[in-house]
């Protein structure tokens, strides 16, 4: 959405200029006490949000309504309705975007910068997700109250991380739809975190609906890409996070995506936006609205060529249920669309009612004294508790991938700090970042740990120059220990930039090999959202340890060194599969199928079993003994099934720390079957997880995992969610020798959720 693509640059620049001209000196809220709107019912707090929004619309002319269907809404000066920019970002903290203005210094010059979602996903800690989201929501409200942002934020990105080449996978918690659904439920609960659903603190926006996970791969650009997706894959993989976000978490906004799905641009698809989203998932609540991705209405006619011109594009989008245009098609062409009879005034009012009733719920039209969130201010931003939470998240999301006993490190001697991330600052934040109060680099953290440091970057992320090798090797030769900090960053993975290779870029592996030849203790710390093939590092005995840290953000250096030195033990798990580099030659990125086929070896851990490092893998500084309290559960009968979200059973594990180091343990519970429902059967499916904190040496803890009926069910070819009778096994963790528990389900197959069938043979509007 927010990229360096020149196609979007003009609108972004114009917005930033307009915000700069405003200077944020005026009040960001309408004057409902003495201004022109004070006599309008929109300011009457005794009325419901829809009635108040409709009163505002009744005072507006058609031209004024149309002007305010765009993201940088100009307001209505004659009514005292201020300009409002709907486009604020907060992926892992309040972030730079057209609607967010960081001051040059002093108040509102920074916000807490948490680890990227892929790093947070590796923690597998739902409570942590909610805590972080609550802080982001509070800081977002503070920025909004001060006129430094809006009150709605276009976050989170919950498209499952299907293909390892995707440039925006870093924005997601990982590849598994169950994990992503759990993540988004707790995230929305924290972000909106209001007194009740009718009084959210901020509005969150689940994006990008639907089937969006290609930027620009071998000439296939997101703006024109048609994602061909089966009903089965749609219901089983691409939809679940959005179903949870809307039906269960009750998010207040959704963003439709650039791409088409099965021939229809998502922002022009009434089946997606009305039949599925609003009707099937019962997301027709007050103030629930849909925005387009930025420029996506343009794409309807310019790239997808679904309709002939801007007027038809605007009409088909509003009619389908896209209420806001992050672009300029609506204000330019809605007047023409209405005059041509392509769009009715009631449909236009429906869109604006949704938008303004959302602002009513946020207290935008309330007197400050009547608004419980208006007191949130600068003192609530970047608090010590928030800073500690950012550090905790970076620690919890770090994953140990290899260790021959070298880790944890001793805190003495001279260490060579090498690699392109060795002194990285904003690189540690990943994308959609905001201005952080500070960023702990690896170099500064090493010095703070008391090491004597020799620093030499050696090479760049994607460099083929060896001019820095000699300095790096000399630093290593003069040190007791070598730590290489590298991986990937925005040079090779970003919005509008997919990878063509999943190997380590540039000559980083060459430098690591030469460092390992020195026979010094060598630890590699890998950064980036996407995985790179670590095969050569895993097989190289000269590489003694390997960590993945993702994008740990402001606390990155301190957090990574806490793990390296053993101040905290690692317990993160990979939230994605690490594929071999040849995987990209076996399946085109444009193939949306999950199941294996003639030109597709399968996607994600559920359908692919030749991983370099599997989904859910993560080592520890200690050892654990894990067992089931019972080996057999049930039997259960489908006749007793009541609802998809009902708990089938609470399965209990016993986890004992049999080593010498206090450590967290992430219990991952996978389901397998070979007879429940039709073939092919997935290799395994994640159905539950829990992060157990601080298990002391010798201590045993009981872990209760609630497994829902819907998690046990499978998706039929037509998209229906079906509970099948049969035999099932539960496996904990990714180690094949861990014990399993079993249960049986008797009875007849039961459809838990009837997938709304899309119209077939879609034609251009």
Swiss-Prot record:
Record key words, sorted: Carbohydrate metabolism, Glycoprotein, Glycosidase, Hydrolase, Polysaccharide degradation, Secreted, Signal, Xylan degradation
Family matches, as Pfam families: Fn3-like, Glyco_hydro_3, Glyco_hydro_3_C
Catalyzed chemical reaction(s): Hydrolysis of (1->4)-beta-D-xylans, to remove successive D-xylose residues from the non-reducing termini
Cellular compartments annotated: Secreted
Gene Ontology biological process: arabinan catabolic process; xylan catabolic process
SUPFAM superfamilies named in the record: (Trans)glycosidases, Beta-D-glucan exohydrolase, C-terminal domain
Pathway assigned to this chain's UniProt record: Glycan degradation; xylan degradation
SMART domains assigned to the protein according to its UniProt record, in alphabetical order: Fn3_like
Function: Xylan 1,4-beta-xylosidase involved in the hydrolysis of xylan, a major structural heterogeneous polysaccharide found in plant biomass representing the second most abundant polysaccharide in the biosphere, after cellulose.
PANTHER family: BETA-D-XYLOSIDASE 5-RELATED (PTHR42721:SF3), SUGAR HYDROLASE-RELATED (PTHR42721)
Entry's family note: Belongs to the glycosyl hydrolase 3 family.
Name of this protein: Probable exo-1,4-beta-xylosidase bxlB
Taxonomy of the source species: Eukaryota, Fungi, Dikarya, Ascomycota, Pezizomycotina
């Amino acid at each position: 959405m927010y990229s360096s693509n020149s196609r979007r640059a003009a609108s972004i620049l114009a917005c930033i200029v307009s915000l700069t001209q405003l200077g944020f000196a005026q009040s960001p809220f309408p004057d409902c006490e003495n201004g022109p709107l004070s006599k309008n019912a929109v300011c009457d707090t005794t009325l419901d949000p829809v009635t108040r929004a409709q009163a505002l619309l009744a005072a507006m002319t058609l031209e004024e309504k149309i002007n305010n269907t765009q993201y940088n809404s100009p307001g209505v000066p004659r009514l005292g309705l201020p300009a409002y920019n709907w486009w604020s970002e907060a992926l892992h903290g309040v972030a730079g975007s057209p609607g967010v203005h960081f001051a040059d210094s002093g108040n509102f010059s920074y916000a807490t910068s948490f680890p990227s979602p892929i790093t947070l996903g590796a923690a597998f800690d739902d409570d942590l997700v909610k805590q972080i989201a609550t802080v982001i929501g509070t800081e977002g409200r503070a920025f909004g109250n001060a006129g430094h942002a809006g009150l709605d934020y276009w976050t989170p990105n919950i498209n499952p991380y299907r293909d390892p080449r995707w440039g925006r996978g870093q924005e997601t918690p990982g590849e598994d739809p169950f994990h992503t659904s759990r993540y988004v439920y707790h995230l929305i609960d924290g972000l909106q975190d209001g007194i009740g659903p009718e009084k959210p603190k901020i509005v969150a926006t689940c994006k990008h609906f639907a089937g969006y996970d290609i930027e620009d791969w071998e000439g296939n650009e997101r703006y024109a890409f048609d994602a061909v997706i089966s009903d089965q894959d749609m219901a089983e993989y691409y939809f679940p996070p959005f179903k949870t976000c809307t039906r269960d978490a009750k998010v207040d906004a959704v963003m439709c995506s650039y791409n088409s799905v099965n021939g229809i641009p998502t922002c022009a698809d009434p089946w997606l936006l009305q039949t599925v989203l609003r009707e099937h998932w019962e997301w027709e609540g007050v103030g629930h609205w849909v925005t387009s991705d930025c420029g996506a209405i343009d794409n309807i006619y310019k790239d997808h060529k679904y309709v002939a011109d801007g007027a038809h594009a605007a009409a088909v989008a509003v009619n389908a249920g896209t209420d806001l245009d992050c672009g300029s098609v609506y204000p330019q062409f809605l007047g023409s669309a209405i005059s041509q009879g392509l769009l009715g005034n009631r449909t236009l009012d429906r869109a604006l009612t949704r938008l303004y009733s959302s602002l009513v719920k946020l207290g935008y039209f309330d007197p400050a004294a009547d608004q419980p969130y208006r007191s949130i201010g600068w003192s609530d931003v970047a608090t010590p508790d928030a800073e500690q939470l950012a550090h905790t998240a970076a620690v919890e999301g770090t994953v140990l991938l290899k260790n021959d006993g070298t880790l944890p490190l001793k805190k003495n001697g001279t260490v060579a700090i090498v690699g392109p991330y060795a002194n990285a600052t904003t690189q540690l934040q990943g994308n959609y970042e905001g201005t952080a109060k500070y960023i702990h680099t690896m170099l500064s953290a090493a010095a703070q740990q008391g090491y004597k440091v020799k620093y030499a970057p050696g090479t760049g992320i994607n460099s083929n120059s060896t001019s820095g090798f000699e300095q790096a090797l000399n630093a290593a030769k003069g040190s007791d220990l070598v730590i290489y900090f590298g991986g990937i960053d925005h040079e090779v993975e970003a919005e509008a930039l997919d990878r063509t290779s999943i190997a380590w870029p540039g000559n980083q592996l060459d430098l690591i090999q030469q460092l390992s030849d020195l026979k010094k203790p060598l630890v590699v710390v890998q950064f980036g959202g996407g995985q790179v093939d670590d095969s050569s590092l895993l097989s190289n005995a000269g590489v003694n340890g390997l960590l993945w840290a993702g994008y740990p953000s402001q606390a990155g250096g301190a957090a990574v060194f806490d793990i390296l030195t053993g101040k905290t033990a690692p317990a993160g798990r990979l939230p994605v599969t690490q594929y071999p580099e040849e995987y990209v030659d076996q399946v085109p990125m444009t193939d949306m199928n999950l199941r294996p086929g003639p030109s597709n070896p399968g996607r994600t851990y559920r359908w692919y079993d030749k991983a370099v490092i599997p989904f859910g893998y993560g080592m520890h500084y200690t050892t654990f003994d894990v067992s089931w309290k019972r080996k057999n559960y049930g039997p259960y009968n489908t006749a007793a099934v009541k609802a998809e979200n009902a708990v089938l059973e609470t399965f209990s594990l016993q986890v004992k720390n049999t080593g010498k180091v206090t450590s967290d343990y992430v219990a991952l519970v996978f389901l397998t079957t070979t007879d429940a429902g039709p073939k092919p059967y997935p290799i395994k499916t994640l159905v539950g997880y829990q992060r157990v904190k601080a298990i002391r040496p010798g201590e045993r803890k009981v872990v209760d995992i609630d497994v829902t009926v819907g998690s046990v069910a499978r998706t039929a070819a037509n998209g229906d969610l079906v509970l099948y009778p049969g035999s099932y096994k539960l496996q904990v963790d990714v180690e094949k020798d861990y014990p399993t528990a079993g249960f049986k389900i008797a009875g007849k197959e039961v459809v838990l959720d009837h997938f709304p069938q899309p119209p077939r043979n879609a034609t251009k509007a």
